[in-house]
Design a protein with these regions (language model features):
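Charged, amphipathic alpha-helical segments and their flanking helix caps
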Residues: 1-34, 47-142
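Charged, often glycine-rich, active-site loop that binds/positions anionic groups
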Residues: 37-47
Length: 142
């Protein structure tokens, strides 16, 4: 089975972020919730995929992803900040994901942490990844 360009991009992002933040787990939902005992984790979620332009048989697309670092405890601020710093550096090291995309840019970051509950923090950062496919075949780059 041939994977879509979008899925190949998501897997490349997952691989880069996982290598950068190891041994912190990177989780792509749907999956089981992060346990309180896990300490820190990074969640990779897809916020959307939109069509930006059509040109003959080529479609320009924008995939929006969210990386959310979550942690519990007294070191939570340092842990989530460090996880996102490492993940960001890994993504920006090769913004075209070794030829899979046209580029990646930070779309939004919420450096004001969200309180999940007492002692828990979530720090999200969003990225936009531009890429091209053929209009008739989502598995082929345009």
């Amino acid at each position: 089975m041939t994977l879509s360009v979008r899925e190949r991009i998501v897997r490349a992002v997952l691989q880069r972020v996982t290598a950068a933040v190891a041994p912190v787990p990177v989780i792509r939902p749907p999956t089981v919730p992060v346990s309180r005992e896990a300490g820190v984790a990074v969640l990779l979620t897809l916020d959307g995929d939109s069509i930006d332009a059509h040109s003959n048989a080529v479609v320009d697309r924008s995939l929006r992803i969210r990386l959310t670092a979550v942690a519990q405890g007294s070191e939570a601020f340092d842990q989530v900040d460090n996880a996102l710093v490492l993940a960001h550096a890994a993504l920006m090291q090769s913004p075209n994901l070794d030829g899979l995309s046209l580029g990646i840019r930070e779309f939004e970051a919420d450096w004001d942490t969200d309180d999940l509950d007492a002692g828990s923090l979530a720090l999200p950062a969003r990225y936009e990844i531009r890429y091209r496919t053929l209009s008739a075949d989502l598995t082929q780059m345009g």
